[in-house]
Regions:
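Charge-rich, low-complexity N-terminal segments
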Residues: 1-53
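Short amphipathic alpha-helical segments that mediate assembly, nucleic-acid/protein binding
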Residues: 10-13, 74-77, 120
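Short aromatic/hydrophobic-glycine micro-motifs
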Residues: 22-26, 86, 149
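Short, internal acidic amphipathic alpha-helical interface segments
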Residues: 60-113
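A short acidic/glycine-rich loop-to-helix N-cap element
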Residues: 114-128
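A conserved amphipathic terminal alpha-helix motif
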Residues: 124-148
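Short, highly charged C-terminal tails/helix-capping segments
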Residues: 142-168
Length: 168
């Protein structure tokens, strides 16, 4: 949303916030930006969920790692993530994976439309999709970002390709 948000948008945002508080969600609110951050966890890790509402009846949900992608693996992992997004057959074109270089974090980002559902199912559906996408790749990215890469220096002894010309 922007500064020119309608009364309906403001009421909808406030109603969602109240619903989440009623469900005991711990929220860090930014009412001027129509956004909030909360902590999410599974049995393996904790991460942040950032939700930002926009003025065109859509919102963005980001699951963001609390662990850091190390500098030496940042570019390598970012390239791999871009390939995952390109070749992801299960994608519904609402959610993508990303590396935020500034924060050095792994993210799953979901764009969705704000609905008129009294039970806020539009939000919880996007939340479920986003956290499932995040969890599906998080362990792999975390492990890949902590390993060093070693290169084999091929010699005549360990090369799969013959080092000398073979005569017929």
């Amino acid at each position: 949303m922007s500064l020119a948000a309608s009364d309906r948008d403001i009421e909808g945002f406030n109603a969602l916030i109240q619903e989440l508080k009623n469900r005991d969600w711990d929220l860090l609110l930014n009412r001027e930006e129509f956004a909030f951050i909360t902590a999410v966890a599974n049995e393996h890790e904790k991460w942040e969920l950032e939700v930002q509402f926009h003025d065109d009846s859509r919102f963005t949900t980001k699951s963001r790692s609390r662990w850091v992608v190390k500098d030496e693996s940042l570019n390598r992992i970012e390239r791999a993530i871009k390939r995952f997004n390109f070749y992801d057959d299960d994608s519904n074109d609402r959610t993508i994976w990303k590396i935020d270089k500034k924060l050095q974090s792994f993210e799953a980002i979901t764009e969705a439309k704000v609905g008129d559902d009294v039970d806020f199912s539009y939000f919880f559906d996007a939340f479920d999709e986003n956290t499932n996408y995040y969890q599906s790749l998080s362990d792999t990215v975390r492990k890949a970002s902590t390993i060093g890469i070693e290169y084999n220096h091929f010699s005549e002894k360990n090369s799969l390709i013959p080092q000398r010309t073979i005569k017929n």
